[in-house]
Structure formats: structure tokens, C-alpha cells
Amino acid sequence: MEDVKLEFPSLPQCKEDAEEWTYPMRREMQEILPGLFLGPYSSAMKSKLPVLQKHGITHIICIRQNIEANFIKPNFQQLFRYLVLDIADNPVENIIRFFPMTKEFIDGSLQMGGKVLVHGNAGISRSAAFVIAYIMETFGMKYRDAFAYVQERRFCINPNAGFVHQLQEYEAIYLAKLTIQMMSPLQIERSLSVHSGTTGSLKRTHEEEDDFGTMQVATAQNG
């Protein structure tokens, strides 16, 4: 594939007056990026409507599994726009397939001047993984750097091992996707041609090796 230089925006730096983390803060939401918040379901309950409105929340991503639907609910569908994802906090759950739609949802909100809250149940594993993935793709970051950035703002995050593995894999996936999006049709065609030519060369090499091996066997038999 031809070299395509990807450019990413600068990552906002941590506020100098950032509040020191205390245990009770895990039950509240924190602003990870300007306009992007991460928290537990308790930060999106009916009793927290004044807090949500105070922070200017307009969009909410609610992450839950089916058995949690009885108590984790989109409580303000008349006031906020919701994206509800049915995802279990299970290491074998495929979360990569949901990353594109969540990025589109968050980008759409921020571009129109809105603010987004991403929450699961505890705001530690599932929702944290999605915020990390968003930061990775938006700012061109590796998993470990995006994790550290989010943890500076919400110290209690701890995506399960399966989610961590998928986030580490996602780096190559989003870079390849963005590279293809940046390439012109001619560049893509050239890259495919180069790849095809390389494959053909390898095939010819293997065929030549097979022919040479056959000749050696025939010579040995005749000798």
C-alpha cells in the first residue's frame, strides 16, 4: 500500500486545576474530552437530570446487556438523543463492530455543539472501552496512551482483558481504514497492482523451486 500521511488533531491537555480523584467520584461522570463524558448508570438516573442539564448533555450512549435492561434504561428519551447498545461485560463479546457507529454518534453530537455522556453500569469496563476506542481513532493514538489519558480523568476505569485485546487490535484496523479513505482511486489501484505483482512473483518463485526439485530427482534417478 502506498504511503499516505495521516494527520490527526492535537489531544486536549489535562486541566491544571483538575480535581484530585476520590473514591466517591466513581459514582459520578467525568469530562474526558471537551463535550465527551464518561460515567456509571447512576450519573444518568432520573434523579440526575439537573446535573445532566447543568453540564449541557444532549446525547447519551447507554451500554447494557439484555438482563440489565430492567434497571438500566434511557430515562430521558424526550430530552436527549440516545444510542442504546446491547453489550455484555464479557471478554468474548465482540465490541469492535460497534466502534464505527459510536464514533459517528459522538462526532455528530460534537459537530452540532452538543455534549455526550457514555455510560454502562459502573462506567469502568464497557463504556470506558468505547471512550478509549474513540480517542484512539480520533487522535491517532495507541491503546496504552489512550487508556492513560482516560484514566487521568476517571481513575477507576478497568476494561476486561478481552476488551483490552480488541482495543490493541483496533489500532491497525482504524489506521488501515483511514489510510484507504485518504487514498485516491488511482493510489488504491496501484497498491492492488503492486500486491498482485508481488503475489505473482512469489507464485513464480515457488513454481521454479518445484521445477528445480523435480529436475534434481530426475537426475538422481538417471544417475
Curated annotation (Swiss-Prot):
Naming one, the record's GO cellular component terms include: cytosol
Q: Which InterPro entries match?
A: Dual-sp_phosphatase_cat-dom, Prot-tyrosine_phosphatase-like, STYX-Interacting_Phosphatase, Tyr_Pase_dom, TYR_PHOSPHATASE_DUAL_dom
Which superkingdom, per the lineage? Eukaryota
Could you list this entry's UniProt keywords, alphabetically sorted.
Answer: Cytoplasm, Nucleus, Phosphoprotein
Q: Mainly resides where?
A: nucleus
Q: Which residues are annotated as modified residue Phosphoserine in the UniProt record?
A: 184, 193, 201
Q: List, for all copies, the residue spans of the domain called Tyrosine-protein phosphatase.
A: 28-176
Q: Which CDD domains match?
A: DSP_STYX (cd14522)
- What PROSITE patterns does this protein's entry cite? TYR_PHOSPHATASE_2, TYR_PHOSPHATASE_DUAL
What biological processes does GO assign it? negative regulation of protein binding; negative regulation of SCF-dependent proteasomal ubiquitin-dependent catabolic process; regulation of ERK1 and ERK2 cascade
Quote the subcellular location field of this record: Nucleus; Cytoplasm, Cytosol
Q: Name one GO molecular function term.
A: F-box domain binding
Cite the residue spans of the region called Disordered: 197-223
Function of the molecule: Catalytically inactive phosphatase. Acts as a nuclear anchor for MAPK1/MAPK3 (ERK1/ERK2). Modulates cell-fate decisions and cell migration by spatiotemporal regulation of MAPK1/MAPK3 (ERK1/ERK2). By binding to the F-box of FBXW7, prevents the assembly of FBXW7 into the SCF E3 ubiquitin-protein ligase complex, and thereby inhibits degradation of its substrates. Plays a role in spermatogenesis.
Subunit field text: Interacts with MAPK1; independently of MAPK1 phosphorylation status. Interacts with CARHSP1/Crhsp-24. Interacts (via FQQ motif) with FBXW7 isoforms 1 (via F-box domain) and 3 (via F-box domain); the interaction is direct and prevents FBXW7 interaction with SKP1, a component of the SCF(FBXW7) complex. Does not interact with FBXW7 isoform 2.
Per the record, the similarity remark reads: Belongs to the protein-tyrosine phosphatase family. Non-receptor class subfamily.
For this entry, the protein name equals: Serine/threonine/tyrosine-interacting protein
Q: Which gene encodes it?
A: STYX
